C-alpha cells in the first residue's frame, strides 16, 4: 500500500449527502451504495471528482494531489480505520506544522503562526514534540524541517527520497506536482477498498468533523444554529444515519425492548440490543454499618432535645445579678445550637462507594462484535492544569504535575493535557517544553515497570525499597538511568531563569549594536538614539509574545496576546512500540511510547477587560479544549496537585459510565496533602471535612466542588440540565417528583435543545456561548460521547457499543487558529460565560458556586475515595499563611450569602439536606461574631465575680454533663464511620476556634464592606514552597510572620490568662471566697486556652528555641499578677503577725 497521497472512495448512505440515492450514477459499492470520488483542496474543502477526472492519470491539477475518505458510517456501512493505514503526506505535514508553530492572536490582531524549529535550548528526540530533531529540507535556500511520521522518520512523498518540508511540498503541488529532486510527477497510490463491516461507528470531530469549512471563524453569523444536533433528525441517536431504524436490525426490535421494560432514549433502550450478556454494574453504593450509623443518628436526636431543654431552662432562669452576662451567653448559645444543627443534619446518611475496574476493561477495552479490534471505547478526557506566577508557583512543581498526568493509566489517544499560564511567562513555557522532552523517557518507564506514584520527584523521594514488587531483570538498570535523566532535568529546569536572562541580554545587546550601527550609517546623533525595548527572547531568536521581564506595551502580565502551542501533537490511534536498539540505554521495544497531547495556553489579557482570575482561566481552557480535542469529560488540577494513583481516572469513569451516570455532573476526589507536619498542628489535612462532611453529602445529592481534583461532564459545565430531573416539593421538600422530556417520542430520537433548556432557541445559542461555529458544533458531540453504554433497560440516553473506537481527527492550522480566537479577551462579551455557562464569576470561591449551580439544576455528584490516594498536593503549614488561606475561603462564603447563590433562593431541584449544607457554607463565617464574644465571657465572668448562671445547681451540671457526653459520643461515632483519627477530630476543633476568632471574623468584615460600600477584595496568590533536598521540609512551620489576623487570638489568650490570675488571687484573699464561681469561670477559660494551644506553639517559633515573646509574656504576667496582688490584698500585718482573714498564714 502506498504511503503517498491517493484516491479513496466516498460512500454516502441513502438520503445523506448529494448523489447518495439509488438513482445516482457512478459505480456501486458492495452494499449497493453509490461510490463517489473526491479531492481535498488546499483550503481544506472536499470537491467531488467525475469519472473523467479519475481517468486523467498524470494530468491532475495542483489541488488534486490529496485525497481522503469521507464515509458516513452506519451499522450497514462502517469504514476500515485501523492505524496500519498511513495518513496522507499532506495531513502529516499539517500535523507537523501545527506542532512546530506558536500561534498568537487576540483583540484587533490577526492570528499568526510562528514556525519554531527550536523550542528549548536542549535537544528534543520524541517525534510528537515541537522542535523534534530530524532531517532538513533539501530545497536550496530553505532551512525547514523535513516532514516526519509518528515515529519521527522522514516522510518521502517521492520514490527518490528527496527530503522536503511542508511549505516546499505545498509549493511543489502548485507547480504541477513535480518532485524537485527527480523532476517526476508525484505518484498517487491507490488505497484498497474499505471493509464495510469493521464494526466501528464514525463520529465527526470536535470542530464539525471532516467539514473543514466550519473551522474558519464565522464572523457574519451564517452558521445554521438549527442544525447543531439539537434537532429531531440530528447526527446521533436512534433513527438517523448513525443508527438507522431499519436495515440490519429486526423489525421487532421495539417489541423486544418493551419486553425488557426499556423506554428508549437516544441510543438507550430504544436502540439495538447489545450482546446478550449478564449486566455487570461498574460501581456499588455501600451503606454504613447499622451498628455505627444508627447510634449516630440517635445521639443527634438526643442532643437536639437536650439543647432544646437546656436553652429553655436557661431562658426561664436568668441570672438577675448579671443580666448583661446572661444575655450575651444566651444569644451566643442559641446561635451555636443553630449552627450545630446546620452542620449535623446533612451528616445523617453517609455512604461508601466501590468500583470494579475489571468490568470497565471488559466493557470498553475487550474485543467484541461491535469492537472486533479491541480498541478503547472509553470517552476522551481533557486534563487542565492552571498556574499564574512562576515565582510563587515553582515551575519544577508544575512540570512534575504535568509528567504525572502524561503517565496516567488511560488510553493515550483519548487523553489531552492543557496548561493554562495566566502570567504568560516564557519560564513556564520552556519548563513545559522540558517536561514534554523528559516525558519521552519517564512515561514509557512508568508503563514498563508499573511505577507508583508517577510524579518523578515524589517517586524518587519515597523512602523504602524501590525494588519491592518488581520482577523485571532490567528494573534496577532502568531506574538508575531514569534517575540520572531526572536529575539532569531538574538542573535544566533550575537553570532556565538564568538561561532566559542571559539569552535575552545577549539578543538585546545585539539589537543595541544594530541600532548604533544604523545611527552611524545614517549620520544621526548617537546621543539622541531611540531607546531599544528590553525584550524577552525565545530559544529560536524571536520575541516572546507574552510577558517580558521588563514590562512593555503588549508584553505585561495584564496586557499580552493569546498564546497557544501544541507541545506534543495528538498521538497515532494505534500503539507505537519502541525500537530495539543497542544504542538505547533503556529497552522500550515492548512498551507503547506514545504520549498524550500536551498544549500550552496563555489567554489574552488586555487593559479594560475583566479577566476574572482563575474562573476566567478555566473557562478559556474549556473553550480551547472543546475546539481542539473536545473530551466529553474534564479533570482540573492546581499546579501543585499531582496524580498519585494512576488508576484514579478509570475509577471516576466507572461512575460516569454506569447506570444513572448520565445524571452525574462531576466526580470529586478528596484532597490529600504531603509535607504536612506529623502532628498536623493547623488541621491542614482537613480530614474531618474530606472524610466526614463530604462522605455524608455523597449520600444526598453529592459532594461540593472544592476547586481541584474534580472530573466534570463537559455538557453540565455548559449550563444544561440533566436528562432526568427530580424536583422536591411539598412540606420540607420531601416529596420527590421525577420529570423527563415532554415528548415520549424524543426518547427514540436525538435530543433537542428545548429538551435540555426550554429557554434556549437557535438565535440565543451565540448569545449564550459566543460566536464560534466550531465550538458550538462541538457541544452535541461532547454530549453524545459522554453517555454510558446502552446495555441496560434503565440506561436512558445511552450510546451504542463501539461508537468511540474511531480515532480523533488530526489537528490542522484552522482548528488551532479558532482555539486562539476563543481564548481572546473579548470573546465572552455579551455572552453567558461566567453567569450560567462554565465556571461562575463574582466570588473568590468560584468552585463552590459552580458546583452549587449544577446541583441547583438537578445534577448529582459523586465522591470517589480510592484505596491509594488519588491525588496529592501541598498546603501552607505556616500559621499566617494558613489563616490567609482560610480567610479567602470564608470571604467567598460571605459573598455567597449576600448573592443570588444563597441556598435560601435555590430551586426545587435541590434536596432539603443538600440545601441545608449549602446554607451552612454561606452562614458559617458569621459564627465568628458569637464565638469571639463567647471566648471573652469566661474572662468577664472571672473579672466581675459573676457567672452565666446564678448558681451552679444540679440542673445546670446535669445539662452540662449530658451535652458533653453526647458531644463526645458523636465525635467517637463520627471518627468510626469516617475513618479519621480522634486526634484529627480534636485538631479540627482547635483550629475551628483559632480560625473562627481571626480569619472568619475578618471575612465577615470584608464581606460586609464589599456589599455595603462596594470595596473590592483582592487576595495574593499563596506561594508554594519548593524545598531543596537537604532543607528541612518543616522549616516554614516555625517561621512567625506578623499579620493583623493574629491580634484577636492573642488578645483572647492574654485576657483569659490575666482573668484566671486575677480571680485566683481575689478568691484566695477574699473574706468569703466563692470557689464555685471561680471554678466555673476558670474551667471555661482553660477550655478556651486549650483550643488556642496550637496557636501559642505557632507564635513560639522553632522547637528548642525560646523566642523573645515568651520573655515578654512572662514579664507581663508577673507584673500584672504582682500589681493585682498588691491592689487586692496589701501586705498589712496584724498584731499577731498574721495576714488578714481569708489569706494564707505562715507559721
From Swiss-Prot:
Does Transmembrane count among this protein's keywords? yes
Q: Which InterPro entries match?
A: Cellulose_synth, Nucleotide-diphossugar_trans, Znf_RING/FYVE/PHD
Report which superkingdom the organism of origin falls in.
Eukaryota
Primary localization class, coarse: Golgi
Instruction: Name the enzyme group at the top EC level.
Output: transferase
Membrane topology of the entry: Multi-pass membrane protein
Q: Where in the cell is it found?
A: Golgi apparatus membrane
Q: Looking at the UniProt record for this protein, which Gene Ontology cellular component terms does it annotate, in alphabetical order? A: Golgi membrane; plasma membrane
Question: Which Pfam families does the protein's record reference?
Answer: Cellulose_synt (PF03552), zf-RING_4 (PF14570)
Active-site residue list = 422, 847
Q: Care to name a GO molecular-function term for this sequence?
A: cellulose synthase (UDP-forming) activity
Supply the EC number(s): 2.4.1.-
Q: Which UniProt keywords apply?
A: Cell wall biogenesis/degradation, Glycosyltransferase, Golgi apparatus, Membrane, Transferase, Transmembrane, Transmembrane helix
According to its UniProt entry, the protein's GO biological process terms are:
cell wall organization; cellulose biosynthetic process; plant-type primary cell wall biogenesis
Q: Where is this region: Disordered?
A: 1-33, 259-281
Transmembrane stretches, by residue range? 292-312, 322-342, 929-949, 954-974, 1001-1021, 1045-1065, 1075-1095, 1108-1128
Gly residues composition bias: which ranges? Answer: 14-29, 262-272
Q: Which family does the UniProt entry place this protein in?
A: Belongs to the glycosyltransferase 2 family. Plant cellulose synthase-like D subfamily.
Function of this protein? Thought to be a Golgi-localized beta-glycan synthase that polymerize the backbones of noncellulosic polysaccharides (hemicelluloses) of plant cell wall.
Q: What is this protein called?
A: Cellulose synthase-like protein D3
Gene it is expressed from: CSLD3
